[in-house]
Amino acid sequence: RISGYLQDVFKFRTKQGLFTLVGGVRGSYWSYNREFIFSPRASIGFIPNFDQNLTFRLASGLYYQSPFYKELRTTVQDEHGNSIIQLNKNLKSQRSIHVIAGGDYTFRASGRNFKVSADMYYKKLDNLNPYTVDNVKIRYYGENCAQGHAMGLDVKFFGEFVPGTDSWI
């Protein structure tokens, strides 16, 4: 397996505020399943001049998750009707296309720093390898036969609630 990553950051200021652009790409090749993946991603951040405690963000990109050993396992029938386990060399990485919009607000209270972060996200998923659960046993299908999506809102409150200790809620 071979992989590489390249990223650059570009900052510029306008009369409205500070912009930060981040662009990157990850590439990898896995000889086991002969898969080459190319994952571009980009984000933009903005800190407005009217309130330096605010930050707005927008990001998007492709994310791939290579299969683990347990995911490669698939059940097939031999010529006698017996079920046997073998590894699927055609199984590809699961893929997600992410879009995220969010922001932060930092402030001081009681002499300590605090930050509220909120992010809305949408992820389109494909090449999924589903699984079944039987009590504590997880059995993967061993095939890229599903797709899905995830969306939501993450809100975090960070601060020094106990002096000297950073915490997240």
Region spans (language model):
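Transmembrane beta-barrel strands of outer-membrane/channel proteins
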Residues: 23-27, 44, 58-62, 71, ...
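Transmembrane beta-barrel architecture of outer-membrane proteins
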Residues: 1-5, 37-41, 55, 96-100, ...
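Outer-membrane beta-barrel translocator/channel fold
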Residues: 49-99, 105-106
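Transmembrane beta-strands of outer-membrane beta-barrel pores
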Residues: 2, 25-31, 60-66, 75, ...
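Outer-membrane beta-barrel translocator domains and adjoining extracellular loop/strand segments
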Residues: 33-39, 69-75, 82-84, 128-136
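Outer-membrane beta-barrel channels and translocator barrels
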Residues: 12-17, 47-51, 96, 107-111, ...
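Membrane-embedded beta-barrel scaffold of Gram-negative outer-membrane proteins
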Residues: 90-151, 166-167
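Surface-exposed extracellular loop regions of Gram-negative outer-membrane beta-barrel proteins
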Residues: 1-32, 37-45, 157-168
